[in-house]
Amino acid sequence: MDCLTNLRSAEGKVDQASKILILLVAWWGFGTTAEGYPLQQLWELPCDCSGGYVSSIPTYYTYSLDCGGSTAYLTYGSGTGSWSWGGGFKQQWECVFKPKIIPSVQGQPGPCPSECLQIATQMHSTCYEKTQECTLLGKTYFTAILQKTKLGSYEDGPNKLIQASCTGTVGKPVCWDPVAPVYVSDGGGPTDMIREESVRERLEEIIRHSYPSVQYHPLALPRSRGVDLDPQTSDILEATHQVLNATNPKLAENCWLCMTLGTPIPAAIPTNGNVTLDGNCSLSLPFGCNPPGSIDVSCYAGEADNRTGIPVGYVHFTNCTSIQEVTNETSQMGNLTRLCPPPGHVFVCGNNMAYTALPNKWIGLCILASIVPDISIISGEEPIPLPSIEYTARRHKRAVQFIPLLVGLGISGATLAGGTGLGVSVHTYHKLSNQLIEDVQALSGTINDLQDQIDSLAEVVLQNRRGLDLLTAEQGGICLALQEKCCFYANKSGIVRDKIRKLQEDLIERKRALYDNPLWSGLNGFLPYLLPLLGPLFGLILFLTLGPCIMKTLTRIIHDKIQAVKS
């Protein structure tokens, strides 16, 4: 009876010690879970590569998507960071860079290896690590060291492109034609890149013949935009805020709208609709978009002569519920020169490229989609890491919680599938999409201008990084630069253009009040440098104080338990 009592007492002490450890871990903290975190995980865009970049294709994945310079894989295996605290494996998008293309020496490719006795018509990009051009009998080919063999397959379904095969001897050089058959894809490698560039050149030629070029008089050249926003970008911001105000007014009345610096890649929302065969739409160069995961939607297939057709590619991220074939004869009805989507829509085809219209004699598989800007949202209640005490005291920046626009707008799976019964009319989203389609080229130019300003400013403030966080605050107050994004403040009335200037004035006032404080200037000015040491010092003292007590308690409990078992 005494042994049983001692054993229960020992178990109680172990349980109590475990609770103390849990409390200590909780004291140090895992960090708070951001509001809307599950939604953000659900709506992470594939090409954002939330799971990071890996060197090889993941062993366990359910879906893959071409992202231009890399391929995204939706993994679920036991890789690093894939286990979720809620139980089970957390899916995440991991990206693998595509094979490198080695540039030619002085612009002239060398001769092909002697092992290339036969020239393959296709070679998948997963079968080699890097490639370069070579010449044989006056023709240019690709050559690489074969890493593995592979059979051609319909990985994305029988209505999609055939994935190229890999033939040859592993470890030996292989050569293949840079132009693959029109219905074969090398998984986004150099062959697909050449096809995409060829389509762009064909479309440029069509546009050049369709629309006369504008010649500016030397005395009437357009003036540079400078640091101010052009009307197109302002329209995108205002339209986005209007839609956000209609769907989520609480968030819209106090928030930051953040645009990614560099080339914008809008998000595509697959929809169903009716295309028109009147050709009354403008044709422009395709632009990249960021699609969601796999979804069921109607598809459009273009059939034409392989020799004269324009291969726009085959969409990968969707399952076709139905396929409407647009043959060459159909597209020539009424002297039609292009296939037009409904207003506010685009065609999304191969390599995630969006087309405002499809030219005559196009070849491929496309879907209809609306697009929303590449904009993230920061709640106005989120503390923005302005360069005040944080940087004066040499503290690290706080992580800013960005909310994807799809989450902020409340676009659900029902919306993506074309469902009805939405709180806000789908017409509202299409209106925003139409605005973005019209201004996508100008939008790219404006954001690139802002990127140039960051680069110029970075050279000036290379030793004072705080300047990057108030970009253009002293140059007109355009936006706040946070984590490679350009953020604009908005309230219920719209975009507030003087917000950055007000923040700058408030920051100067706070710094002046801080430096005027005698405590701050104490210790001959060493106090700002001592503050960063207080946190680690306090943690060390706490560990040295509680550590021996915890270890002593655990040792005594284990010793008592062993003695109880022996007796």
Swiss-Prot record:
UniProt keyword terms in alphabetical order: Cleavage on pair of basic residues, Coiled coil, Disulfide bond, Fusion of virus membrane with host cell membrane, Fusion of virus membrane with host membrane, Glycoprotein, Host cell membrane, Host membrane, Host-virus interaction, Lipoprotein, Membrane, Palmitate, Signal, Transmembrane, Transmembrane helix, Viral attachment to host cell, Viral envelope protein, Viral penetration into host cytoplasm, Virion, Virus entry into host cell
Residues that span the membrane, as ranges: 526-546
Free-text description of this protein's post-translational modifications in UniProt: Specific enzymatic cleavages in vivo yield mature proteins. Envelope glycoproteins are synthesized as an inactive precursor that is N-glycosylated and processed likely by host cell furin or by a furin-like protease in the Golgi to yield the mature SU and TM proteins. The cleavage site between SU and TM requires the minimal sequence [KR]-X-[KR]-R.
Annotated motif CXXC, positions: 255-258
Signal peptide: 1-35
Cysteine pairings via disulfide bonds: 255-258, 255-487, 479-486
Region (Fusion peptide): 402-422
Extracellular face of the membrane: 36-525
InterPro entries in the record: TLV/ENV_coat_polyprotein
S-palmitoyl cysteine lipid sites: 549
Glycan-modified residues: 245, 274, 280, 306, 319, 328, 335, 491
Stretch list, region Immunosuppression: 462-478
Any GO CC annotation of this UniProt entry: host cell plasma membrane
Chain ranges on the Cytoplasmic side, renumbered to this chain: 547-567
Domain of life: Viruses
Motif CX6CC: chain residues: 479-487
Site (Cleavage): 398-399
Coiled coil: 423-473, 483-519
Assembly: The mature envelope protein (Env) consists of a trimer of SU-TM heterodimers attached by a labile interchain disulfide bond.
Domain notes per entry: The 17 amino acids long immunosuppressive region is present in many retroviral envelope proteins. Synthetic peptides derived from this relatively conserved sequence inhibit immune function in vitro and in vivo.
Known role: The surface protein (SU) attaches the virus to the host cell by binding to its receptor. This interaction triggers the refolding of the transmembrane protein (TM) and is thought to activate its fusogenic potential by unmasking its fusion peptide. Fusion occurs at the host cell plasma membrane.
Official protein name in the record: Envelope glycoprotein
Organism: Avian spleen necrosis virus
Name of the encoding gene: env
